């Protein structure tokens, strides 16, 4: 059982990948990447929160008190996340029914159903761990049921806590080594035995950091960006990617909320 707790100390965060094409997202996942499409009656789910592209063309976040207010404005509608970070609902004839309005630099974005009941668009990735690249002998588990695959800014993994996606696991091991199991080669931080009671955290500048019980930095991804909210996604293809900062999110108090556009910020 993953030990995923809210980290109550000051945080800072980051992950970077070139844009790429993605096939239609599978129903039941909790994120949508640039180029992916949520088909009619498709769902993105996280706990009690369910984002549905309804057959009446309305995009609704159930239990999150938000909708696109596009009911009966089209047929066979689909939701797409563009490579400029904009969510777009298109009619079956290809015409645009609704757009989020948040656009930024071209890149690889992620729209995530947040566990607090918001749909959040995170800007281009700033760091990735790809187990298809040589570096560690392949380490494979048996078929592992899908559980938690997200780590947000301010959260930590510790004591064999893990993120899982299909047959892949990212584990913050008790020996202080961060290991991504699965893929052709797997991946590790090579920090075995370098500390005690180590934990992994994602800060608010998009940086992954392993610290020991004295809060000494054992390892970091060494990529950081502007201050904001980031997310580490262990994707179904086994690649762990940090996206952020957030540029748009739904809000129950308003139809939509814009968060600052992505620029090259100073560290």
UniProtKB/Swiss-Prot annotation:
Molecular function terms from GO: D-mannose binding
The entry's keywords: Disulfide bond, Hemagglutinin, Lectin, Mannose-binding, Repeat, Secreted, Signal
Chain positions recorded as beta-D-mannose binding sites: 54-58, 62, 66-67, 173-177, 181, 185-188
UniProt motif (Carbohydrate-binding motif 2) ranges: 173-181
Main location: secreted
Disulfide bonds: 57-77, 176-198
Chain ranges for the short sequence motif Carbohydrate-binding motif 1 as given in the UniProt record: 54-62
Subcellular location: Secreted
Biological process according to GO: response to other organism
CDD domains named among the record's database cross-references: B_lectin
Domain Bulb-type lectin: 29-134, 148-255
Subunit structure: Forms heterotetramer of 2 chains 1 and 2 chains 2 arranged as a dimer of chain 1 and chain 2 heterodimers.
Summary of the function given for this chain in its UniProt record: Mannose-specific lectin. Shows agglutinating activity towards erythrocytes from rabbit.
The protein's name in its UniProt record: Mannose-specific lectin 1
Organism: Colocasia esculenta
């Amino acid at each position: 059982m993953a030990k995923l707790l809210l980290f109550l100390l000051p945080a800072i965060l980051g992950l970077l990948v070139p844009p790429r094409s993605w096939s239609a997202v599978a129903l039941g996942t909790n994120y949508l990447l640039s180029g992916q499409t949520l088909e009619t009656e498709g769902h993105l789910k996280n706990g009690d929160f369910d984002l549905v592209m309804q057959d009446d063309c309305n995009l609704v976040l159930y239990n999150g008190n938000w909708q696109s207010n596009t009911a009966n404005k089209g047929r066979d509608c689909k939701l797409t996340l563009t490579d400029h970070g904009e969510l777009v609902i298109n009619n079956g004839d290809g015409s645009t029914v609704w757009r989020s309005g948040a656009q930024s630099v071209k890149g690889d974005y992620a729209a995530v159903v947040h566990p607090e009941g918001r749909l959040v668009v995170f800007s281009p990735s700033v760091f990735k761990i790809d187990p298809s690249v040589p570096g560690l002998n392949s380490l494979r588990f048996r078929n592992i049921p899908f559980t938690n695959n997200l780590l947000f800014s301010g959260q930590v993994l510790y004591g064999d806590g893990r993120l899982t996606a299909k047959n892949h696991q990212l584990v913050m091991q008790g020996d202080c080594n961060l290991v991504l199991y699965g893929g052709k080669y797997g991946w590790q931080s090579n920090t075995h035995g370098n500390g005690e009671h180590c934990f992994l955290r994602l800060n608010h500048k998009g940086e992954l950091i392993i610290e020991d019980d004295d809060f000494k930095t054992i390892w970091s991804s060494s990529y950081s960006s502007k201050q904001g909210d980031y997310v580490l996604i262990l994707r179904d293809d086994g690649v762990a990617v940090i996206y952020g900062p957030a540029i748009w999110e739904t809000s129950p108090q308003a139809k939509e909320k814009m968060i600052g556009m992505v620029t090259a910020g100073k560290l």
